[in-house]
């Protein structure tokens, strides 16, 4: 197998390929131009998007040429893959703002001095519908399209005609990138298999060129929790939507069984180092988790931000001397302390828990600390004297901490 593809396989990135043997031979002969597409449905990517772009980075490190295709055009349609209902159609202005924000995030992850970032609205916005149907639609079989899982599932719940067109547009993207940049490989999540295969087929039938599609596995957690979701919602790459500290802590607190897998997927550490640190047992495995959290935070937010997050976590949970300013905080109104405030009420209002019953249960079980003092009384109250230093630290167990400031 080609060296670059071997790296992807070793690190857990390979799921399906249209013709792995032929792709491997071609990648041994030439520097492959390849692309990953992402629609601009949000102002930020989330960690689920990291998998294809980490694969992109590994291929680029082996000399291959990446294209990040941001879907300013396809977002106006909406991909039905993995969705039970039609996506909300965004205003043009929102899509343009999202495209700009996503491009800025990608520039932190991929070196595009040796690659491209392209917005597919460059060609999709100018399509003549009649010509598109005659030139492109003729190559698509409705019967075949309905055989793909995305459409089969959605037909039961309702599939709009606008969504049904999405596969044609994504296939057209591959066709255009092959014409413009000699792109011969599309990489995407496994839910994109139908769209990718259709693009491969279109390029071959329209241009007579063999191109390839490669999909990546759906990443899961061993504890059954959905990857990329936290108690605070989606784990975004934008620090304004999901703080750098919380991002660091998300990876610091992954299940023990996932540490090795995530080190391979979310870092650029060498195999030997990953095998070594993931072999740690007991409390020593925390060192591997800290390495994982630091490395992926460095990739997404930069080394300086990763160091600050690591320092803040050390100060919060190990009693270190790090800067605590990066620890999440909740600002409490002074009027709330005119008398006293129940700790249970403060826990709910600060959203460190979702309900009073959860707060009481945690207090009763001995899992709640105020300034490192365990609180066992469900009726425990705080007043102005509690905030003599202007803030308190509220901690639940070993993983969740919040500064309450005045």
From Swiss-Prot:
Protein's cellular compartments: Cytoplasm
GO process annotations (BP): tyrosyl-tRNA aminoacylation
EC number: 6.1.1.1
Keywords: Aminoacyl-tRNA synthetase, ATP-binding, Cytoplasm, Ligase, Nucleotide-binding, Protein biosynthesis, RNA-binding
Catalytic activity annotation: tRNA(Tyr) + L-tyrosine + ATP = L-tyrosyl-tRNA(Tyr) + AMP + diphosphate + H(+)
Chain ranges for the short sequence motif 'HIGH' region as given in the UniProt record: 40-49
Molecular functions per Gene Ontology: ATP binding; RNA binding; tyrosine-tRNA ligase activity
Positions of ATP binding: 229
UniProt-listed InterPro entries: aa-tRNA-synth_Ic, Rossmann-like_a/b/a_fold, S4_RNA-bd, S4_RNA-bd_sf, SYY-like_C, Tyr-tRNA-ligase, Tyr-tRNA-ligase_bac-type, Tyr-tRNA-ligase_bac_1
Motif 'KMSKS' region, residue numbers: 226-230
Domain S4 RNA-binding: 341-405
Binding annotation for L-tyrosine: 35, 166, 170
CDD domains reported for this sequence: TyrRS_core
CC terms in the record's Gene Ontology section: cytosol
Entry keyword annotation includes Transmembrane helix: no
Quaternary structure, from the entry: Homodimer.
NCBIfam families in UniProt: tyrS (TIGR00234)
Function: Catalyzes the attachment of tyrosine to tRNA(Tyr) in a two-step reaction: tyrosine is first activated by ATP to form Tyr-AMP and then transferred to the acceptor end of tRNA(Tyr).
PANTHER family per the UniProt record, alphabetical: TYROSINE--TRNA LIGASE, MITOCHONDRIAL, TYROSYL-TRNA SYNTHETASE
Family statement drawn from the similarity comment of this UniProt entry: Belongs to the class-I aminoacyl-tRNA synthetase family. TyrS type 1 subfamily.
UniProt name for this protein: Tyrosine--tRNA ligase
Gene from which this protein is expressed: tyrS
